[in-house]
Amino acid sequence: LLLAGLCCLLPGSLAEDPQGDAAQKTDTPPHDQNHPTLNKITPSLAEFAFSLYRQLAHQSNSTNIFFSPVSIATAFAMLSLGTKADTHSEILEGLNFNLTEIPEAQVHEGFQELLRTLNKPDSQLQLTTGNGLFLNKSLKVVDKFLEDVKNLYHSEAFSVNFEDTEEAKKQINNYVEKGTQGKVVDLVKELDRDTVFALVNYIFFKGKWERPFEVEATEEEDFHVDQATTVKVPMMRRLGMFNIYHCEKLSSWVLLMKYLGNATAIFFLPDEGKLQHLENELTHDIITKFLENENRRSANLHLPKLAITGTYDLKTVLGHLGITKVFSNGADLSGVTEDAPLKLSKAVHKAVLTIDEKGTEAAGAMFLEAIPMSIPPEVKFNKPFVFLMIEQNTKSPLFIGKVVNPTQK
């Protein structure tokens, strides 16, 4: 059994064609009034995001981090529909769901509403998700599992001959490549001949900055990886009004930058020596307060252009969050098939990020704003920083990352 997740985040002009038939689009009313179960799972999603982030940060303080909490949580919540006993409870508890406070049915209903909302058409923001089940032709799958993953997670099912590993790998990778518009390729590099079932989740984001940077203003500047290492990076620059302020609790500058549509990027620039403090203090409640409060002021902003990739074997890191049984010989996946005992052999997640000046298709577009006469602070993201990408309607953490070295591939 293989579980693979992937995501892609791109700024820039929107593609002319819609995503295609891989992702389902549904009109969704505003979630605050009509989606109480979604409101119930969002805090758990955020805390899962920070728990997973802290585990990855603990493993290495010298590498970039980038992943999609929504993608990983969706894949494992979907998989939990086919698990039983300890395997089942471990997954949901590892995703930070307290089943004494929220019934399991509401967890899955919350994900159903989340996926519906994320896939809602938006003329200014391209955001699509997809779930694919690749099943061995000889595998007899429990009907209820297929029905549940289709109805609750909008999943598509594909019949595959896993004995032909090259062809099966090609099918999975083609599905992924199509879903991410060619940005994530060769997600699955190796496939075991014994594989009978693969679950793939993707999330694709492409947005335009509400207030783009001017390409002409970008210049090469120093980025201080650590006290001994400095690299040259293209630094986007703009003097203007920003939703930015210094948060004493986090010992960090906090910058919120909106995309056109329903997404916001939050950047955290920690004070000297305060990166770990920032990482330990981030919570769902703090993020919610940032999103609800506007703190506009003038600033001279320097933000590096980015192109980073995060690839993770989740078996180890999720083990630290208590999800172990599903990877062991004692796994109970009898809700998927009763043919033979299954275990999750591999869980792969890949995320791709690009941040640049792009943000408008209009040639010669210009944006002017009034700047107070007082000297604005200069805020340079020229040392390791943390960032989040939030979907505004659901307050869901689409992506979370840390930039230690912008030149690291």
UniProtKB/Swiss-Prot annotation:
One of its GO terms (cellular component) is extracellular space. The reactive center loop (RCL) extends out from the body of the protein and directs binding to the target protease. The protease cleaves the serpin at the reactive site within the RCL, establishing a covalent linkage between the carboxyl group of the serpin reactive site and the serine hydroxyl of the protease. The resulting inactive serpin-protease complex is highly stable. SMART domains: SERPIN. It comes from the Eukaryota. It is found in: Secreted. Residues 1-15 form the signal peptide. Its main location: secreted. This is Alpha-1-antitrypsin. One of its GO terms (biological process) is acute-phase response. Plasma. Belongs to the serpin family. It comes from Papio anubis. Glycans are attached at residues 61, 98, 136, 262. Residues 18-39 are annotated as: Disordered. GO terms for molecular function: serine-type endopeptidase inhibitor activity. Residues 364-383 are annotated as: RCL. The record marks 373-374 as: Reactive bond. The modification Phosphoserine is found at residue 374. Keywords: Acute phase, Glycoprotein, Phosphoprotein, Protease inhibitor, Secreted, Serine protease inhibitor, Signal. Interacts with CELA2A. Interacts with ERGIC3 and LMAN1/ERGIC53. Interacts with PRSS1/Trypsin. Coiled coil: none annotated. Gene3D superfamilies: Alpha-1-antitrypsin, domain 1 (2.30.39.10), Antithrombin, subunit I, domain 2 (3.30.497.10), Serpins superfamily (2.10.310.10). Inhibitor of serine proteases. Its primary target is elastase, but it also has a moderate affinity for plasmin and thrombin. Inhibits trypsin, chymotrypsin and plasminogen activator.
